[in-house]
Amino acid sequence: MPELPEVETVKRGLAPTMEGALLVRAELRRPDLRFPFPENFEDAVAGRRIVALSRRAKYLTIELEGGDVIIAHLGMSGSFRIEFDGPGEGRIKESADPAVPGDFHRPRSKDEKHDHVVFHLDASCGPARVIYNDPRRFGFMALARREALAEHVFLRGLGEEPTGNALDAAYLAARFSGKAQPLKAALLDQRTIAGLGNIYVCEALWRSGLSPKRAAGTLVDKRARPKQALVQLTDAIRAVIADAIAAGGSSLKDHIQADGSLGYFQHSFSVYDREGEACRTSGCRGTVERIVQAGRSTFYCPHCQK
């Protein structure tokens, strides 16, 4: 499932084409994805200019002129691509570095089997199509008003973003104080950190030398202040997310960028999906193990993560 860095990468790839463009019409090729599309979705968004693209946790938001906002979730296998309706000056850009999000767009191609939504745009570079493809159909789209966005059923109750200054050790100490819950489960709670998923929790715990099985409350002292280990964990979370965004996310099964290229952070994994391989901590002679926590795979080194 695409996590925060993947969705951020998609947002950055779509924004140069979509922001400021006129959404001429939305074409729905089926009545639903994971959930039914909002009633009159096509009519509600047609003829509206796109003001801005943003991201909240693992959700992409597309703000339209007039205050309506499209909320999109990629589910397990969803992806966007940008295609232009014909050759023309400035419509197709190629970069020496195709991994840069948004620097490469494709000419129009034949429709693919799982192209379920097509946004037809009048963009600054000419007519374009932004196509949502989702083989498993676990993604979904919803509509909300800008002023009520934070309280939308999909967004309300989300915790702090791991990319902002609000996520610090004091914040996590307040959330973890007195908790016997395993550290990994506490970090995956979207009410604590919005958008943080399985891959990047494993990587952050390895970077900070902490066991995923350790009780979250052990990182907080008796006065509910963060111990140094929690400070290090907070720094590791922010760093691993920043590194993953810079690498364009991780391409494991289904994630591709809006330009059709792959993310590269999976080549930097230190523990995730490395069961049985040597730990990459300097001087550590341990090997990466896989355990299951709450039905999900956890990868860690029991030798150096305590």
Curated annotation (Swiss-Prot):
One of its GO terms (biological process) is base-excision repair. This is Formamidopyrimidine-DNA glycosylase. One of its GO terms (molecular function) is damaged DNA binding. Its EC number is 3.2.2.23, 4.2.99.18. It catalyses: Hydrolysis of DNA containing ring-opened 7-methylguanine residues, releasing 2,6-diamino-4-hydroxy-5-(N-methyl)formamidopyrimidine; 2'-deoxyribonucleotide-(2'-deoxyribose 5'-phosphate)-2'-deoxyribonucleotide-DNA = a 3'-end 2'-deoxyribonucleotide-(2,3-dehydro-2,3-deoxyribose 5'-phosphate)-DNA + a 5'-end 5'-phospho-2'-deoxyribonucleoside-DNA + H(+). Keywords: DNA damage, DNA repair, DNA-binding, Glycosidase, Hydrolase, Lyase, Metal-binding, Multifunctional enzyme, Zinc, Zinc-finger. Its cofactor is Zn(2+). DNA binds at H114, R136, K179. It comes from the Bacteria. Involved in base excision repair of DNA damaged by oxidation or by mutagenic agents. Acts as a DNA glycosylase that recognizes and removes damaged bases. Has a preference for oxidized purines, such as 7,8-dihydro-8-oxoguanine (8-oxoG). Has AP (apurinic/apyrimidinic) lyase activity and introduces nicks in the DNA strand. Cleaves the DNA backbone by beta-delta elimination to generate a single-strand break at the site of the removed base with both 3'- and 5'-phosphates. Monomer. Pfam families: Fapy_DNA_glyco, H2TH, zf-FPG_IleRS. The active site is at P2 (schiff-base intermediate with dna), E3 (proton donor), K58 (proton donor), R296 (proton donor). A zinc finger (FPG-type) spans 270-306. InterPro entries: DNA_glyclase/AP_lyase_DNA-bd, Formamido-pyr_DNA_Glyclase, FPG_cat, MutM-like_N-ter, Ribosomal_uS13-like_H2TH, Znf_DNA_glyclase/AP_lyase, Znf_FPG/IleRS. The keyword Lyase applies. Belongs to the FPG family. Binds 1 zinc ion per subunit.
